[in-house]
Amino acid sequence: FTIADAKTGAILASASNPSFNPNKLDITNYLNPLVSYAYEPGSTMKIFSFMAAMENGIYDGSKEYMSGKLQIGSDTVNDFNKVGWGKINFDTGFSYSSNTAASLLALDLGNEKLRAFYDLLGFGQKTGITLPDEVTGKIDFQYPIELATASFGQGITTTPIQNIQALTSIAND
């Protein structure tokens, strides 16, 4: 777990369960999961995808769309429950954690604007925290289906410290 000051972004405490015996002094391959591993962030990324749409002036929370599934070329994006909730608005889609809502917004934004917003939040780059072995994660999407899945945190990787940094930017605004 990690505790951060929402106003400053400072890490106040962080702890993890080690995969080694801490009583042995020969710890040669310890990596801190806060900074040294990148993961697919999943639905937490929807927060930032919706933010990107708002910041770029294309978000209309009352606009309706058909939830459930979205066809993108030969690929299909499904909401987690596979059937959706019928025709709903984007505000409701956000509250239901709709993959199709995030995908539609990302497709409206396009690759460049979504990537620029993710870059602005610090995804895909080191945060500069003074802990060893920080990795960058990978924010890479080119095709429409990759853009769509990135909007709900699949096909990209981030580190926990990047997610914390991005979330504290919201709390601090």
Where are these regions (language model features)?
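Beta-lactam-recognizing serine transpeptidase/beta-lactamase-like catalytic domain environment
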Residues: 1-38, 48-173
